[in-house]
């Protein structure tokens, strides 16, 4: 049975609708990757609880991003078509530096996808979608990329992963204080 057309749909191009569905999948994938990272650092043989908390928070944030896009899709009269979520590229995140580098790469990919979605919305003359992406995503992405870049820099300066104490201290003193602000 074909999906009936929405009575609320207005100025919402099919290409934008499809791109929003792809972005939903990417946000869910990012959430899945962060969830994997979180529970890796929660293992008894890794035991970096603030890395685990940090990545769990990131996972929840990415899932919220997906849900916000799903809500937008319904508000605009689009249809949500969920796809399979790819498994993370690895199960063993090795160490904090590797995980932070992977997270930085992931956030840059998510940001690039959002920029492409914004470009498409501009080309299809959809100011509402442009505003939505600008308001809810772009600034937050830039801040996340900067934060992860800073974490990578500090872990490298501390000698991670060569010196295990560096990760322990970063976990305790940097990530351990991030939830107090």
Swiss-Prot record:
It holds the Pfam family Ferritin. Its EC number is 1.16.3.1. InterPro entries: Ferritin, Ferritin-like, Ferritin-like_diiron, Ferritin-like_SF, Ferritin_CS, Ferritin_DPS_dom. Induction: By duck hepatitis virus type I (DHV-1). By polyinosinic:polycytidylic acid (poly I:C) which mimicks viral double-stranded RNA. GO terms for molecular function: ferric iron binding; ferrous iron binding; ferroxidase activity; RNA binding. PANTHER family: FERRITIN, FERRITIN HEAVY CHAIN. Residues 10-159 form the Ferritin-like diiron domain. Expressed in erythroblasts (at protein level). Expressed in heart, liver, spleen, lung, kidney, large intestine, small intestine, muscle, glandular stomach, ovary and oviduct. It comes from the Eukaryota. It is an enzyme of class 1 (oxidoreductase). The lineage of its organism: Eukaryota, Metazoa, Chordata, Craniata, Vertebrata. One of its GO terms (cellular component) is autophagosome. One of its GO terms (biological process) is intracellular iron ion homeostasis. Belongs to the ferritin family. Fe cation 1 binds at residues 27, 62, 65. Its main location: cytoplasm. It is found in: Cytoplasm; Lysosome; Cytoplasmic vesicle, Autophagosome. The gene is FTH1. It catalyses: 4 Fe(2+) + O2 + 4 H(+) = 4 Fe(3+) + 2 H2O. Keywords: Cytoplasm, Cytoplasmic vesicle, Iron, Iron storage, Lysosome, Metal-binding, Oxidoreductase, RNA-binding. Stores iron in a soluble, non-toxic, readily available form. Important for iron homeostasis. Has ferroxidase activity. Iron is taken up in the ferrous form and deposited as ferric hydroxides after oxidation. Also plays a role in delivery of iron to cells. Mediates iron uptake in capsule cells of the developing kidney. Delivery to lysosomes is mediated by the cargo receptor NCOA4 for autophagic degradation and release of iron. Inhibits translation of various mRNA species in vitro. Associates with a 35S prosome-like particle that contains non-translated mRNAs in a complex with proteins. May be involved in pre-translational regulation of some mRNA. This is Ferritin heavy chain. It comes from Anas platyrhynchos. Oligomer of 24 subunits. There are two types of subunits: L (light) chain and H (heavy) chain. The major chain can be light or heavy, depending on the species and tissue type. The functional molecule forms a roughly spherical shell with a diameter of 12 nm and contains a central cavity into which the insoluble mineral iron core is deposited. Fe cation 2 binds at residues 62, 107, 141.
